[in-house]
Amino acid sequence: MFELVDNVPQSAVIKVIGVGGGGGNAVNHMAATSIEGIEFICANTDAQALKNITARTVLQLGSGVTKGLGAGANPEVGREAAMEDRERIAEVLQGTDMVFITTGMGGGTGTGAAPVIAEVAKGLGILTVAVVTRPFPFEGRKRMQVAEEGIRLLAEHVDSLITIPNEKLLTILGKDASLLSAFAKADDVLAGAVRGISDIIKLSGMINVDFADVKTVMSEMGMAMMGTGFASGPNRAREATEAAIRNPLLEDVHLQGARGILVNITAGPDLSLGEYSDVGNIIEQFASDQAMVKVGTVIDPDMRDELHVTVVATGLGTRADKPMKVVDNTLQPAGAAAAAPAVPRGDQTVNYKDYERPTVQRQSHAASATAAKINPQDDLDYLDIPAFLRRQAD
């Protein structure tokens, strides 16, 4: 007797949970932009704020703690509220393969509750990725300190953490931008990060990257970044990849030595083997030797000339394999740093007789000593760094 077996692959269940006011705004924005195949959840202590949410599932946290009010910018209240409803959080996340936790760090509910939600998700075996923003500078030093502590706690309970500093928006939008447009752009960036990663999973392509690949690259990796680049013309592959890597809206993290890398190339039928190779070669230059690299392609028949590249790099900060050498090319007066003997470090000692020599003699001696120590190999090592990354370092 034959038994019919359903061999149709099941799509990964992906959910996005926005926590607090900032997370709720981001979820509303994502739902409006029609990111397909994702279920949206909003969690907040403020019952009034939840009334304006369009997400399919809303979760009021800690009604016994806050009585339906907000957390009053107190992360401890947000944490207690989430702890009160741990079972309900687990219930709405049940059966999920991957969850994005998004919030604006620095407030009460988002900062306090997000680590608790992440801990619950991880306990259920869910691939847990947080995409959060740091406050704008004008929001105050106190809020920034609260955000930093919240990010530290959140990092302990997620597989990968993408941090987006709102300060970068000021550089891009300019100081004349309205407050509403600034916060709307922050929501755009959060939505873009979620869409970029989910599309890698959801969109099938000629060279496919599936959920298992994403899980391998993003599990237990810590600090991560996500960037997208678009380009057209004869050098579109290289330009799009470099644009994705140096995305100005992402945190200032060192890409050198990334341990996990996901790349998705989306282009029309005219995508060439050489362009595919160009993308891979650029990625290889900043990946560690042991990095898990997955490059997928999606052919969109409607695309003409333009090429899109999405890069997700994880496990950042471990750069032992290919250390990045930063060279300071800032011109300084000769011997300026040698006007006084160097401050001792470790077991070094100061020769106080040096102070008896005129400054001009000390400077001349220091300049000669520095010239004698120049190692030509240093310059050769520097050339191992991709040109566009050297320009960033300079």
Curated annotation (Swiss-Prot):
SUPFAM superfamilies: Tubulin C-terminal domain-like, Tubulin nucleotide-binding domain-like. One of its GO terms (cellular component) is cell division site. GTP binds at residues 21-25, 108-110, 139, 143, 187. Essential cell division protein that forms a contractile ring structure (Z ring) at the future cell division site. The regulation of the ring assembly controls the timing and the location of cell division. One of the functions of the FtsZ ring is to recruit other cell division proteins to the septum to produce a new cell wall between the dividing cells. Binds GTP and shows GTPase activity. The keyword GTP-binding applies. GO terms for biological process: division septum assembly; FtsZ-dependent cytokinesis; protein polymerization. It is found in: Cytoplasm. The keyword Disulfide bond does not apply. NCBIfam families: ftsZ. Keywords: Cell cycle, Cell division, Cytoplasm, GTP-binding, Nucleotide-binding, Septation. The gene is ftsZ. Coiled coil: none annotated. SMART domains: Tubulin, Tubulin_C. This is Cell division protein FtsZ. CDD domains: FtsZ_type1. InterPro entries: Cell_div_FtsZ (IPR000158), Cell_div_FtsZ_CS (IPR020805), FtsZ/CetZ (IPR045061), FtsZ_C (IPR024757), Tub_FtsZ_C (IPR008280), Tubulin/FtsZ-like_C (IPR037103), Tubulin/FtsZ_2-layer-sand-dom (IPR018316), Tubulin/FtsZ_GTPase_sf (IPR036525). Homodimer. Polymerizes to form a dynamic ring structure in a strictly GTP-dependent manner. Interacts directly with several other division proteins. One of its GO terms (molecular function) is GTPase activity. It comes from Azotobacter vinelandii. Belongs to the FtsZ family.
